[in-house]
């Protein structure tokens, strides 16, 4: 008895998501195809959607002359102990906040700059 398309569809519908993912990868390898959608060229040039960054890192690039003030702010922002905050301030560039939202990153940057540090937000 020959296997029909309906038999294949019924079998595939019974697979888990992980099994489906593995099956797609095997199809891509065996037949040299990609599961990515093909972009259709139109008469007008399509605008590329720019993905807005949602997670930011706050990095001290220079502690400046007022290191004690910067250390205090680093401790307040991170909850680090005195030694860890001092090390983070002296061993620049040093990431103070990682994976935070834009507002938190900008507030941290403002506080650190007011204390005398030079800061980057990436």
UniProtKB/Swiss-Prot annotation:
One of its GO terms (biological process) is translation. Keywords: Ribonucleoprotein, Ribosomal protein. One of its GO terms (cellular component) is cytosolic large ribosomal subunit. It holds the Pfam family Ribosomal_L12_N. GO terms for molecular function: mRNA binding; structural constituent of ribosome. Gene3D superfamilies: 3.30.1390.10, Single helix bin (1.20.5.710). Belongs to the bacterial ribosomal protein bL12 family. Forms part of the ribosomal stalk which helps the ribosome interact with GTP-bound translation factors. Is thus essential for accurate translation. Homodimer. Part of the ribosomal stalk of the 50S ribosomal subunit. Forms a multimeric L10(L12)X complex, where L10 forms an elongated spine to which 2 to 4 L12 dimers bind in a sequential fashion. Binds GTP-bound translation factors. This is Large ribosomal subunit protein bL12. It comes from Sulfurimonas denitrificans (strain ATCC 33889 / DSM 1251) (Thiomicrospira denitrificans (strain ATCC 33889 / DSM 1251)). The lineage of its organism: Bacteria, Pseudomonadati, Campylobacterota, Epsilonproteobacteria, Campylobacterales.
């Amino acid at each position: 008895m020959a296997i029909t398309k309906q038999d294949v569809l019924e079998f595939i519908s019974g697979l888990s998501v992980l099994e489906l993912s593995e099956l797609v990868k095997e199809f891509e390898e065996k037949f040299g195809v990609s599961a990515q959608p093909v972009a259709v060229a139109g008469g007008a040039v399509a605008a590329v959607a720019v993905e807005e960054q949602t997670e930011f890192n706050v990095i001290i690039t220079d502690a400046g002359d007022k290191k004690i003030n910067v250390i205090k702010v680093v401790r307040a922002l991170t909850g680090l102990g005195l030694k860890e905050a001092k090390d983070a301030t002296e061993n620049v560039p040093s990431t103070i906040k990682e994976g935070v939202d834009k507002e938190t990153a900008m507030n941290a940057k403002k506080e650190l700059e007011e204390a005398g540090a030079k800061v980057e937000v990436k």
